[in-house]
């Protein structure tokens, strides 16, 4: 009698987050089966966002309870398609968006996809990009131009298109306005460049001189190391010779939130984009009496990705200086450490490489 062969599920390697304050282990996990309209993407790059550190280092809760695969800045190659996924072929280079909308709720139907009632963020609501593969419905994918490296695709998926959405849609920064950005990470540097396209006067605040030097090279009108001045707010106002029309806070700590609102003039707009679980550390009375507008900004609709791709093709956006380090998947904890130590703007993880 012949023994039946076991029907084992295909497996992949992934960095699986279980608990905060612990290293992330590499595990073998089953490949998810494809729905008819799904595309399986072989992940070439997933860059590390500071929000990933919030889960690991601060215990910020993911929407999906762990275990979960983190990572939301994803680019790769189509490996397999579902029966009705006809828009892409194996071998196509694609960008996976950092926020996935349902397309059917009242917000999606009114072109406000970032406010989707069923919004899914890879690495937060669903498994993300620190893995060899991800399955995504074909309607969420965007083609990555052949001349663009995969790490640029990862930047486009989140920080570049998110910055475009913030500047051109959520805030609509105007020519001649004074803008202060707290944080010279990938998002802050991307917002800087988008705001300069709107001919704003842009000033950057950070604690690392090497990042501020990149900001200056990217066109910042002024930079300030907040660790090298007595009172940050006084240093910013002296640099501006006044106060700001728009303040964009990309870090999310109570300290920087207070600093940000204190450099904003009456009637100004304060944008919150640093992902955190803090309560707001300033008085409601200040918002009321100064008639300050608080604006949240998260992600971007898929339709804005082609606009960002065109800006890059037209050489209006720089990005190479934002890529600081590269690591294979099994060095995921070392990759995270580069951000912890302030040694990186964007560190890129390559899930399907064993050596870099």
Which residue stretches match the model-derived regions?
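C-terminal hydrophobic helical "lid"/dimerization subdomain
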Residues: 2-10, 258-262, 302-356
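Residues in the short beta-alpha loop(s) of Rossmann-like NAD(P)-binding domains
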Residues: 20, 208, 276, 300
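Glycine-rich beta-strand-centered segment in the early N-terminal region that forms part
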Residues: 32-46, 59-106, 145-148
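NAD(P)H dinucleotide-binding glycine-rich loop of Rossmann-like/cofactor-binding domains
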Residues: 102-182, 320
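Mid-domain Rossmann-like dinucleotide-binding core that forms the NAD(H)/NADP(H) cofactor-binding site
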Residues: 146-229, 235
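Glycine-rich cofactor phosphate-binding loops and adjacent beta1-alpha1 units
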Residues: 171, 213-293, 355-356
């Amino acid at each position: 009698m012949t023994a039946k062969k076991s029907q084992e599920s295909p497996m992949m390697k992934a960095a699986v987050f279980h608990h905060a304050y612990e290293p992330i282990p590499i595990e073998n996990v089953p490949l998810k089966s494809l729905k008819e309209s799904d595309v399986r993407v072989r992940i070439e790059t997933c860059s590390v966002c500071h929000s990933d550190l919030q889960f690991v280092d601060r215990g910020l809760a993911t929407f999906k309870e762990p275990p979960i695969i983190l990572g939301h800045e994803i680019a790769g190659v189509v490996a397999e398609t579902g029966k009705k996924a006809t828009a892409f072929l194996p071998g196509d280079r694609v960008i996976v968006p950092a926020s996935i909308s349902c397309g059917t709720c009242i917000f999606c139907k009114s072109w406000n996809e970032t406010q989707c009632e069923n919004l899914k963020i890879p690495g937060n609501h669903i498994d993300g990009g620190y893995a060899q593969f991800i399955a995504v419905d074909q309607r969420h994918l965007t083609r990555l131009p052949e001349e663009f490296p995969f790490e640029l695709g990862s930047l486009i998926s989140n920080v570049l298109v998110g910055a475009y959405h913030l500047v051109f849609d959520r805030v609509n920064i105007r020519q001649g306005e004074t803008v202060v950005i707290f944080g010279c990470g990938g998002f802050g540097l991307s917002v800087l460049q988008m705001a300069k396209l709107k001919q704003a006067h842009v000033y950057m605040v950070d604690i690392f001189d090497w990042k501020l030097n990149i900001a200056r090279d990217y066109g910042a009108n002024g930079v300030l190391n907040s660790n090298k001045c007595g009172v940050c707010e006084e240093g910013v106002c002296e640099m501006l010779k006044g106060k700001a029309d728009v303040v964009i806070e990309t870090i999310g700590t109570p300290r920087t939130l207070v600093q940000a609102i204190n450099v904003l003039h009456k009637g100004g707009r304060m944008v919150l984009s640093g992902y955190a679980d803090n309560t707001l550390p300033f008085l409601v009375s200040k918002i009321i009496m100064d008639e300050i507008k608080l604006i949240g900004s998260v992600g971007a609709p898929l339709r804005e990705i082609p606009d960002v791709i065109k800006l890059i093709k037209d050489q209006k956006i720089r990005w190479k200086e934002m890529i600081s380090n590269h690591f294979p998947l099994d060095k995921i904890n070392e990759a995270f450490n580069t951000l912890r130590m302030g040694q990186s703007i964007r560190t890129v993880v390559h899930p399907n490489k064993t050596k870099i």
